[in-house]
Amino acid sequence: MPLKGSHPNRAKVVRGVFEGAYNYMKSGQLLRQVINKVNGIDFNNLADRKHFGDVYEQLLNDLQSAGNAGEYYTPRGVTSFMVERIDPRPGESLLDTSGGTGGFITCSIRHMRERYVKTVADEQAMQGSLGLIEKKPLPYILCVTNMLLHGIEDPSFVRHDNTLARPYRDYGPGDQVKIILTNCPFGGQEEDGIQDNFPAQFRTRETADLFLALFIRLLQPGGRAGVVLPDGTLFGEGVKTRLKQQLLAECNLHTIVRLPNSVFKPYASIGTNLLFFEK
């Protein structure tokens, strides 16, 4: 049940999306053809508009298959399974801390619209409770577009930022959320200084470990989380052991789903797992 009318924040969102982005087409003729095609689409036609989101996500999937956007895309089968298990509802604050192109949020939107959104008030409650943060400019642009094509009136909840750049201690009760759904970056390391934002017992340059520490802090009492994490976080020692102790002390880790190594190939051959826990 899409909201009607243009939102006053849309112009601000469009400006923010292209800030710092330098993608371009070499052929002016091809660019003109693309503009003409897009200009011919009636985005106010709800009969057509409802298909845009699915078409766009298929394009993102095709990009993954072509090897151009693998770091930004979690297979839809994985996102759908995780959303089904978490079962988000309108009004429950939902956060993706490393949102990529927005797959977890759009999947959650479809889930809530199919099951729980019955009135305009339900739709407003759902749209007002979403949160997403993405560090890199290209997936951020793709994500904002994805939100608009899924009928989100004001996608300003999509932030272009590094979740880990904010000091751990600065996240307080006002920042906590009911639901965390995310596939945090793994196999990489953060830049110098980021680990200093965290308590000494959790300091590491490994991105996935820092995110797990933050998930535990950001989840409300009674909140629930579904996250993708690599084998190293589960079976490693040192900081990883302390993180697991913290997780088990503060949360109920009730389900671990082992994924086949081929799920994220050719972008990563690291063993990965789905963790579901409640605080």
Feature locations, PLM:
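Conserved S-adenosyl-L-methionine
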Residues: 71-179, 187-189, 195-196, 205, ...
